Each structure stands twice: as structure tokens, then as C-alpha cells.
Amino acid sequence: MAKFGRLTPIRFLVLGVLVLAATSWAQKRSPIAEQIAKAYGLDSLGQVEAIRYTFNLELPGRNVSHSWFWEPKTGKISYEGKDKDGKPVKVTFVQSELKGDSPVVKDKIDWLFVNDNYWLVFPFHVYWDSPGAEVQEMGVQKLPLGKGSGKLVKVQYPKGGYTPGDTWDMYVGSDGRIKEFVYHRGNPKSPVPGIVIVTWAGYKKAGPLLFSTDHRGTADGKPVRISFSNVAVKLVGSDTWINAQ
């Protein structure tokens, strides 16, 4: 399997707030996490040279968009959007080469990338992170938002980082696709939302990869929508972008 630029240390932002999770790569990856990731094209990720996308966040009284270009193998990232102070910015960097005093770090642009990228390819990250997380199959459960049911797969990170014990519940269909997703905050003193419940809809395929481009639901009971636009992939050896459709 091709090697890809890992997002290290493992960092997850829920609606823009940083969460750190400790991971041990010595343990074995989860079979169910691998099964889900394969439904989204994990086995074909090596064919992909670059992915571009725009992350859109809609909250009451607040809309945010970030545009990204990402090379999974090299870790090269380009960003167009705003910095932490709301000023327009364009920047290109390789995350593994960043230092603590880098403007990209100080302006939290790399943090934004990790957040947005987790939402875009969350099944891949669950698989990559599974050696250091507890992944459990909980049987078929009723969906928290919509009608119907799905296999509940619970992912809990260890007691470490800024919000220890954070949990993600994936409700998975028979086709391996996530139907709905619930985030539970582990640390009640953390500033992130206590619970985020969203749909996984708007499925589109770009090349060999499958993306969920529309997530609607609530964050601590308030409406939230996270969506992706301008999603496309470029395959190795090609100059043509394949749009998600």
C-alpha cells in the first residue's frame, strides 16, 4: 500500500476548536474501520495524486469557507481563505515540515486543514487512527436523526490530549456507507460543542473515491450544516481534474 502524509500529531477540530488525541501505531488497525474505509475507496487512494475541495460551515449568524489543495502522498497543502484574524490569505506548505514558530502554525491554518480534512475523508482517518483508539461494533441501532437504522460503530480515543475520551458514533449502512454521525465531547470543561449530530448525505464520486458532501444536523441543539463544494481529484500521471458527481 502506498504511503501517505499522515496528519501528525493527530488533531481533530470540531467546528473549529482544536482537539488532540494520542495514538499508538504499534497496535493493530481495526477490521471494521478498514471495511468502512474501503467503501470510500481506501484501496484506490494510491491512484490519487491530488484532491481539491472547499469546506463550508454554516451556523446561525456565521458562514465560513476554506478552499484546499492536498497531495496525500507528499503532504503538500495549499489553502485559500482567512486566517485566525479574518484576513484573506493564500499559502502553500508541507505539514510534516512545519515548525512551531511557522506563520502557518501561528495562524492556525494547519489546524483548519486537519479539521476540514477529517470531515472530508473521516473514514480514512478512523482507519489510520484505529491502532490508538477503541473501535467497537455495537449492533444495529435506530438512527439518531432520520428514519431507519444502521450498524453503530463507536470510536473512542484514549485518555489524553486536551479533550480526553472523545467519542465518535458512526451509523453505517449495509453498503458500508456512513448514514449519520454523532460526536460526544469527552471533557466537560472543553470549549468544543458537547454533542454534534449530523447526517452523511450528498454522496458523490470523484475518480475512485467516494465523498459525503452534505452534513446537516445540530451542535449542542443549534442548527449546523457542513458541506463540501468544488470537490475533485487528479489521478497519478494525469493533468485532468475529475469533478465529484
Feature names for model-found ranges:
Residues 1-9:
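N-terminal secretory signal peptides that target proteins for export/translocation
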Residues 25-35, 96-166, 188-192, 244-245:
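Flexible, processing/modification-adjacent segments and terminal tails
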Residues 28-31, 39-43, 86, 90, ...:
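Intrinsically disordered terminal and processing segments
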Residues 31-106, 133, 137-140:
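N-terminal mature ectodomain segment of secretory-pathway/periplasmic proteins
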Residues 45, 70-72, 119, 168, ...:
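Tryptophan-centric aromatic hotspots in well-structured domains and transmembrane helices
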Residues 147-244:
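Gly/Pro-enriched, hydrophobic low-complexity segments
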